């Protein structure tokens, strides 16, 4: 008796997303390290100088973490209430932060007590930054004002009162000492010049502004608010270049890659989008477990840190390139291994024993081997099989049809079992790779269960969905045939014109030749 031959499962190429250089680059991070903070992480900022520590603002504390440490190496807790927006100076030696009580505090990284305290705001300060000369601080608060402070003298220099709602974000120019930008809940983004004591450019974002980012060159400005990320050309007076709407909820933070070629945005929809700064299309996306409030990238994009509303700090480090020398070389077999048995001489009474290889059969193959056709079909109709490997289910249906027992395997099923079969047909009937097999199976099911249609509302609903799917597929086929007919007509017309022009050309040449002969 011949052995059982397992069912041949036809495999198909997986149609995944296109692998690009951005996909490889942004996927090259290790498994994230999660750190629990005391409250929602409202700001993350990396030091511009080595060793590239980063400051995390959460609740009433500011933690300084080493680049690869999971415990804070320093903590600033001299706040009466919630702390906001801790930001490093360009040299990485000073840190400035706002607070809920309206104060602005300046810290030395090597100390604990604040070096300076700037008092002047009457409400919470959500935005602070250092100017390009390193000796001034810009702050924006919920009292609708923007203030410029002098660090050496601890005095207020200027106050701007052009916003009509909370000032929640801001940044200073990296090139010009006198220019800085603020965003407000009054839907406007304003660029101020300390030399004129007023704003020089004002743009309308259209939503409460949560974050602003000025490119290092100072020519482009990015604003985030609502579901929109907008890019403005400041060299053309604040002209809108592009409006991006790729998030489903409010965008809360912005960040620029080290090369300046990629823009990152974080949102309450728990996603971080990566945009190209040339085409402004999404080139990659990160998913997180909670709504995102803050985002920062380390030097050379070696580390990406994301702060979330649930107090979780997610830290991803880039994978290090494995050295070839570090991989242990496989030991080569000894010489005697290759010459083993070379000089062996066969004898007349030797007995050759073949050890048959044991074949492992899948459960559905075992059922088919023992002619349990209904049980084999039940196994491949399990959700784990129909969703992950539908080609296995289709192959078993095809094998049962080849044996002529598909009708027997489908008959005698209750409401739940026939619903599973119909669900699989509805999900995969329109796929070209499965259509020939499943259409035949659908016809057999209709023939078997046509007398009992109308007795079960659940089954009747499935049949109606299947009917609508078939009608839609017929409409698609009709439209495709009409399109093919129009294309055939166009091709035929073009071919006729070309042949006519060739005949006319040949006729004219012959006429000229005859005239020449007669003359």
Swiss-Prot record:
Disulfide bonds: none annotated. Pfam families: UTP15_C, WD40. It is found in: Nucleus, Nucleolus. There is a cross-link at residue 249 (Glycyl lysine isopeptide (Lys-Gly) (interchain with G-Cter in SUMO2)). GO terms for biological process: positive regulation of rRNA processing; positive regulation of transcription by RNA polymerase I; ribosomal small subunit biogenesis; rRNA processing. It comes from the Eukaryota. SMART domains: WD40. Gene3D superfamilies: YVTN repeat-like/Quinoprotein amine dehydrogenase. WD repeats lie at residues 36-75, 78-117, 120-159, 162-202, 204-242, 246-285, 287-326. The modification N-acetylalanine is found at residue 2. Ribosome biogenesis factor. Involved in nucleolar processing of pre-18S ribosomal RNA. Required for optimal pre-ribosomal RNA transcription by RNA polymerase I. Part of the small subunit (SSU) processome, first precursor of the small eukaryotic ribosomal subunit. During the assembly of the SSU processome in the nucleolus, many ribosome biogenesis factors, an RNA chaperone and ribosomal proteins associate with the nascent pre-rRNA and work in concert to generate RNA folding, modifications, rearrangements and cleavage as well as targeted degradation of pre-ribosomal RNA by the RNA exosome. Part of the small subunit (SSU) processome, composed of more than 70 proteins and the RNA chaperone small nucleolar RNA (snoRNA) U3. May be a component of the proposed t-UTP subcomplex of the ribosomal small subunit (SSU) processome containing at least UTP4, WDR43, HEATR1, UTP15, WDR75. Interacts directly with UTP4 and WDR43. This is U3 small nucleolar RNA-associated protein 15 homolog. It comes from Bos taurus. The gene is UTP15.
């Amino acid at each position: 008796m011949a052995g059982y031959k397992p069912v041949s499962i036809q495999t198909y190429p997986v149609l995944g997303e296109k692998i690009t250089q951005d996909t490889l680059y942004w996927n090259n991070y290790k498994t994230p390290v999660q750190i629990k903070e005391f409250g929602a992480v409202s700001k993350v900022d990396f030091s511009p100088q080595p060793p590239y520590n980063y400051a995390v603002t959460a609740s009433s504390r500011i933690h300084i973490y080493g680049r690869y440490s999971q415990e804070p190496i320093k903590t600033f807790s001299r706040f009466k209430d919630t702390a906001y927006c801790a930001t490093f100076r360009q040299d990485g030696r000073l840190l400035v932060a706002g607070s809920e009580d309206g104060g602005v505090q300046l810290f030395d990284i090597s100390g604990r007590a604040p070096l300076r305290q700037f008092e002047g705001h009457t409400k919470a300060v959500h935005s602070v930054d250092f100017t390009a000369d390193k000796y001034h601080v810009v702050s924006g608060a919920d009292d609708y004002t923007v203030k410029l402070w002098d660090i050496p003298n601890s005095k207020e220099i200027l106050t701007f009162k052009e916003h009509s709602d909370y000032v929640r974000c801001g940044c200073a120019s990296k090139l010009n000492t006198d220019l800085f930008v603020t965003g407000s809940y009054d839907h406007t983004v304003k660029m101020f010049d300390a030399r004129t004591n007023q704003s020089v450019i004002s743009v309308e974002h259209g939503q409460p502004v949560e974050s602003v980012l000025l490119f290092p060159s100072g020519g482009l400005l990015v604003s985030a608010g609502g579901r929109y990320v907008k890019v403005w050309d400041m060299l053309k007076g604040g002209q809108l270049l592009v409006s991006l709407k790729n998030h489903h909820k409010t965008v809360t933070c912005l960040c620029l890659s080290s090369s300046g070629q990629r823009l990152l945005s974080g949102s309450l929809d728990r996603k971080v989008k990566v945009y190209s700064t040339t085409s402004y299309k999404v080139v990659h996306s990160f998913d997180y477990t909670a709504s995102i409030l803050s985002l920062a990238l380390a030097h050379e994009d070696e580390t990406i840190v994301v702060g979330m509303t649930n107090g979780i700090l997610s830290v991803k480090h880039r994978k290090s390139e494995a050295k070839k020398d570090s991989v242990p070389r496989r030991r080569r077999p000894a010489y005697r291994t290759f010459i083993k048995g070379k000089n062996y001489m066969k004898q007349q009474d030797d007995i050759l024993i073949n050890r048959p290889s044991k074949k492992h059969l899948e459960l559905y193959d075992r059922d088919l081997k023992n002619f349990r056709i209904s049980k084999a079909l039940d196994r491949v109709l399990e959700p784990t099989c129909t969703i992950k490997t539908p080609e296995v289910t289709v192959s078993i249906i095809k094998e049962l049809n080849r044996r002529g027992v598909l009708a027997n395997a489908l008959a005698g099923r209750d409401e739940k079992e026939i619903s599973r079969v119909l669900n699989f047909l509805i999900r995969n009937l329109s796929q070209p790779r499965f259509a020939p097999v499943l259409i035949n199976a659908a016809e057999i099911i209709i023939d078997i269960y046509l007398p009992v249609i109308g007795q079960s509302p659940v089954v009747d609903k499935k049949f109606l969905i299947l009917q609508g799917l078939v009608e839609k597929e017929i409409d698609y086929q009709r439209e495709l045939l009409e399109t093919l007919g129009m294309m055939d007509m166009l091709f035929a017309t073009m071919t006729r014109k070309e042949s006519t022009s060739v005949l006319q050309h040949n006729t004219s040449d012959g006429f000229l030749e005859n005239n020449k002969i007669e003359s």
